[in-house]
Amino acid sequence: SREIAKAFGARVFEIAWEDDFSIARNFSLSKASGNWIFVLDADEMVSPKDYDKFRALIGRPSAEPCAYSIQTRNYTLHANTVGLKLNTGEYAEEGGIGWFPSDKVRLFRNDSRIRFVNPVHELVEPALKEAGIPICSCDVPVHHFGKLYEAKTQEKTEAYRDLGKKKLKKDRRSLAALRELAIQSAQVGR
């Protein structure tokens, strides 16, 4: 993805990996120069059919800042996935047999108060709450294909489990960290 970004003229910065996704994300935020931040991973995309809706959303004048929670369609090959919604052909990008939803803030104004927290399953929501920035919803989905590749998914799940253990060790009273670790552990069969 680094090479693809360079091919399209993007400025590409490198950072040493510190076993903490929030550090890497915050480094990228520090390099951003536009008015808006849109968080997207290499195995994710927005459908071209939604580009105009997306442009209209960020082009709207607003009296007060708003961050947008966006639904991610996590495509899967497994029929027993909790919350599975079968593909309907609504999007050409659909993969696998269906998808399960997850929502998180991915679009927000470039504001130094907004930073990611947590070494794994990193979020900006706590920073938004602290800054008093409301969260609005967006009806443009992000299409996530990472769960379609079994070998990579297993490797990633193991890595996330290790990071989850570190996260829980840092805050032993965090029910969210305990829940995330339980899910990751179940996925790797431990």
Describe the function of each predicted region.
Residues S1-E14, E18:
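Acidic donor-binding segment of Leloir-type glycosyltransferases
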Residues A7, N26-W36:
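Active-site nucleotide-sugar/metal-binding loop of Leloir-type enzymes
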Residues D19, N35, I114:
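Glycine-centered loop/turn positions within well-structured domains
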Residues S22-L29, L40, V46-G189:
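Catalytic-site signature of metal-activated, phosphate-bearing donor transferases
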